[in-house]
Swiss-Prot record:
GO terms for biological process: ATP synthesis coupled electron transport. It comes from Buchnera aphidicola subsp. Baizongia pistaciae (strain Bp). The chain crosses the membrane at residues 4-24, 28-48, 60-80. PANTHER family: NADH-UBIQUINONE OXIDOREDUCTASE CHAIN 4L, NADH-UBIQUINONE OXIDOREDUCTASE SUBUNIT ND4L. It is a multi-pass membrane protein. This is NADH-quinone oxidoreductase subunit K. It comes from the Bacteria. The keyword Translocase applies. Belongs to the complex I subunit 4L family. NDH-1 shuttles electrons from NADH, via FMN and iron-sulfur (Fe-S) centers, to quinones in the respiratory chain. The immediate electron acceptor for the enzyme in this species is believed to be ubiquinone. Couples the redox reaction to proton translocation (for every two electrons transferred, four hydrogen ions are translocated across the cytoplasmic membrane), and thus conserves the redox energy in a proton gradient.
Length: 100
């Protein structure tokens, strides 16, 4: 069994990695991937804490978060495809400059 502190440190590291990647990248696709990393790291923290307390609530919440992440990524990818077809770019700075 993985100790609680190791699991939470890993979840914090993954969340921090996703946040830094979200802030640094200008491409919408990479930003979407960074959001998925952050969501999955929060789910990992719930599973680790649930396992520590011998409760299945963390795993149930993981299934809920996994469903939420799948719907978020499918909607995000659909919007990303439409954005690329319309503006021919995925750079967030260039998209914010285009008005109209």
């Amino acid at each position: 069994m993985i100790p609680l502190s190791h699991g939470l440190i890993l979840a914090f590291f993954l969340f921090s990695l996703g946040f830094v990647s979200l802030v640094m990248h200008k491409n919408i696709l990479f930003m979407l991937i960074s959001l998925e990393i952050m969501i999955n790291s929060a789910a990992l923290a719930l599973v680790v804490v649930g396992n520590y307390w011998n409760q299945v609530d963390g795993q149930i919440m993981y299934i809920l978060i996994l469903t939420l992440g799948a719907s978020e990524s499918s909607i995000g990818l659909a919007l990303l495809i439409q954005c690329y077809r319309h503006f021919k770019t995925l750079n967030i700075d260039k998209l914010s400059e285009m008005n109209g």
